[in-house]
């Protein structure tokens, strides 16, 4: 299989097991400490400039950081997080007082609800077919984000203990990268740090949701108890719950300790069948405590 090409949904559907165990692995914020630089220097900066929100940049950035980094929404696809970043400040007094008009994002809501894979190819097709100016502006933002990431995010090696963990996984399981990052960026980053050969497929946002990745590649091919997802966001947990598999959390802010625990303890438990139950529940409970659902400027 050509290691530098981008994969398709057919690759996931036709994925053939070589082991009786499957591991899905997220990338940004999980394998690589890239979320902060991507979000703060690329995503959020370009939200402000694309929709001329300079007057309220402080609040836009605060909201975008909450939505993308410091909440239970962390790790979701860029388009729902763009919508959420704006929706969370629509009624914020400081924003209302500024007089700045926020984008309505009516067409974005329809795109998100359409059921198509939420990536640039589907967005570009829809924007071209409809001539919708809002969709065109979102597509420009998304392409500009990709270009900024390609230019900015370099020489960011994986967290400590990742490589040792991937060595263990490759020897005893079939592994794929399961992400909502564009595939092009994933392939580039995994290749840059010589990690590409540890996974059989790199699945990004163009191939569907994380749960769809797992459904296509793992569900029905492996016993549910032999499916594991490693991730740093609640979306990773819900994705693997959708196929009744297990979850190992990479705790935000404690990533290296999480990977060390995986490498020295958790993966062995998963392989010998003692991972599920009290051990997994304790890890998930610890993980869930780290990420709030409501931003501090919204009263519960």
Which residues fall in each region the model found?
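Alpha-helical substrate-recognition element adjacent to the catalytic core
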Residues: 10-11, 18-20, 30-184
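A short, compositionally biased domain-edge/stem linker segment
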Residues: 4-14
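Residue-level detector of transmembrane insertion/anchoring sites
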Residues: 16-18, 222
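C-terminal cap/substrate-recognition subdomain and adjoining C-terminal extension
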Residues: 2-3, 154-174, 181-300
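A short, hydrophobic secondary-structure junction motif
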Residues: 26, 68-80, 277-287
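Non-catalytic protein-protein interaction scaffold segments in large eukaryotic complex-forming proteins
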Residues: 4, 25-26, 30
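Short loop/turn segments at strand-loop or loop-helix junctions that form parts
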Residues: 25, 141, 251-252
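The start of beta-strands in P-loop NTPase/AAA+ ATPase cores
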Residues: 21-23, 227
